[in-house]
Amino acid sequence: MYSGRLFYFCSMKHLLLFDDPAIRGSLLPFTFTRPIADLRVGILKISEKWEKYAGAEVSYWTQDYLQNLFPRSEQQGIAINGSWLPDSNSWQQVIALKENEALFFGKTLLATACSAQEKSFAFVSEKKIIQATQEPILLQKTWHIFQFNAAEIRKDFILLTAGRKSQPIQDPHTRCYGEHQIFIEEGVQIRAAILNAEGGPIYLGKNSEVQEGALIRGPFALCEGSTV
């Protein structure tokens, strides 16, 4: 037996991440060339975080001049504020929404069902307003990218490594502390480095390189193909 609420969400497989006009301007110049949800905070971009929780693809509702580069899907789906940094509680609130409801925090729209034909958010006025059960983490200022980075690395580390096994460190001259919080993807090269994850996780992305003499303290992330 299923509830109408669950059936509704399961039929809404697509997530549409929208640029909040009240926030986008405060994130310039980064948002000159990309939607808010394409910004990276922690290990993952905001869009990638939502994809991990949803197990579904996302698209973007952004500025007209960016829309061709970041296409909007023609599917009906859930519109989600692109500045919202999700966690498990956020996701539970999203999947609990009914078609006639809109999730707000104060006056800030967080999520609502949305058709592909909508060109503005005027339709939200017809929805039943539901207030979020806890204050959301919103990327509202440029410095939040750095202020939230450590906490987001910790959250993303769990999303990316749950149920997976790290690649081993082959180099005998590399020293590790807090090894249970170090995760190494395939193709990583490490030579004569010190990795200290006692204060937070260390994530080394695919084909990244840690060169000789590097001293790394967590929380820390080296993304795919990068060098330190």
Question: PLM features: residue spans?
Answer:
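Terminal amphipathic alpha-helical/low-complexity segments used for targeting or macromolecular assembly
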Residues: 2-8, 12-180, 187
